[in-house]
Amino acid sequence: MKRRSSFLVFLGLLLASPLALANDQHTVSFGYAQTHLSSLKNSDSKDLRGFNFKYRYEFNETWGMLGSFTATRNEMENYTWKEGKLHKNGSDSVDYGSLMFGPTYRFNDYVSLYGNAGIATMKFNKHSKEDSFAYGAGVIFNPVKSISIDASWEASRFFAVVDTNTFGVSVGYRF
């Protein structure tokens, strides 16, 4: 997952570089993401934590496109108490990733909204894997012309019973 995540981020940066020569506005942002799984409601397990990378291209003063890549993970150690000692039973891991695209709408120099849709992947213990439709929305603030602050939400459903909600906050550079 780490190798694939690194490759996708590198590929996104590589593909975005020629676009930077155009006169239009671009924003690249990076931040924190946290995924909550509905199946963990009554569990001691923690939410998945990771990162979010976004690239925004504005066609004109109002409309643009946004691409988003999210990767979160959690690894849990399993222990049992046997014969007065604590024994490690192994570990479980959950990986979540999404790649989404969608339109952006700029209300003024400071506030933009966006919606996006794409594909998400969830993997349990490197064995059980499923792809699913993902969708999301977010708001982007530009407190100054070259800085963006983004708050996002995305959702998906896996294995017909596991709902995911991913929340993200990122900071970006607008050029």
Explain the meaning of each model-derived region.
Residues 1-25:
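Cleavable N-terminal export/targeting peptides
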Residues 28, 49-53, 97-101, 133-137, ...:
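Hydrophobic, lipid-facing positions within transmembrane beta-strands of outer-membrane proteins
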Residues 34-47, 70-95, 119-133, 159-162:
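Flexible, solvent-exposed loop segments that connect beta-strands
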Residues 20-73:
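Short glycine/proline- and aromatic-enriched beta-strand/turn motifs that initiate or cap beta-hairpins
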Residues 28-34, 67-71, 115-119, 151-155, ...:
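Transmembrane beta-barrel strands of outer-membrane/channel proteins
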